[in-house]
Curated annotation (Swiss-Prot):
Function: With S4 and S12 plays an important role in translational accuracy. Located at the back of the 30S subunit body where it stabilizes the conformation of the head with respect to the body.
Record text on subunit structure and interactions: Part of the 30S ribosomal subunit. Contacts proteins S4 and S8.
Any one GO biological process: translation
GO terms of molecular function: rRNA binding; structural constituent of ribosome
Protein name: Small ribosomal subunit protein uS5
UniProt xrefs under InterPro entries: Ribosomal_Su5_D2-typ_SF, Ribosomal_uS5, Ribosomal_uS5_bac-type, Ribosomal_uS5_C, Ribosomal_uS5_N, Ribosomal_uS5_N_CS, Ribsml_uS5_D2-typ_fold_subgr
Domain S5 DRBM, residue spans: 13-76
Xref: SUPFAM superfamilies: dsRNA-binding domain-like, Ribosomal protein S5 domain 2-like
Keyword GTP-binding: no
Family according to the record: Belongs to the universal ribosomal protein uS5 family.
Length: 165
């Protein structure tokens, strides 16, 4: 029974390919190609993960990246309604990411990679700006760092030892 529940949860996850890179190595017989893939997995309800993998075949790199993403799932519980509770600015290596809450009806105003991450996280209204590096891996890490750093109003009041209504 438990196994079927877990497999049902896995079935709800949607997998998207963010980036595919092809590298070549010059050898005696010619060029040897290898591939790397950055994969995003999410259910649109706050569960999200990413994986990076390399392989000699593109399909193997995508499959391995998907497996890695499923192993690295996180849950974002601090989403309030369709947006985030507060503004956040995060640095990750050379990339900076600014996330701002938005009113209902705004939609996701962000670049393509960050937009995909936020859609798969289940955020509906947000404004995001990517600053600094446009390295895909650093942008993804910055987005995950930003989403994990969010705290709900209730959490903040509890930390400040203020009674909340």
């Amino acid at each position: 029974m438990t196994l079927s529940k877990n497999s049902h949860k896995e079935d709800q996850l949607e997998e998207k390919v963010l980036v595919v890179n092809r590298c070549s190595k010059v050898v005696k017989g010619g060029r040897k190609f290898s591939f790397s893939a950055l994969i995003l997995v999410g259910d649109g309800k706050g569960r999200l993960g990413y994986g990076f993998a390399k392989a000699n075949e593109l399909t193997d790199a995508i499959r391995k990246g998907g497996e890695a993403a499923r192993k690295n799932l996180i849950t974002i519980e601090s989403l309030e309604g369709d947006s985030i509770p507060h503004e956040v600015l995060v640095d990750q290596d050379g990339a900076q990411l600014l996330l701002k809450p938005a009113k209902p009806g705004t939609g996701i105003v962000a670049g393509s990679r960050i937009r995909l991450i936020l859609e798969m996280a289940g955020v509906k209204n947000i404004v995001a700006k990517s600053l600094g590096s446009n390295n895909p891996m650093n942008q993804v890490k910055a987005a995950f760092k930003a989403l994990l750093s969010l705290s709900s109003r209730k959490d903040v009041l509890t930390r400040r030892k203020v009674t909340h209504d």
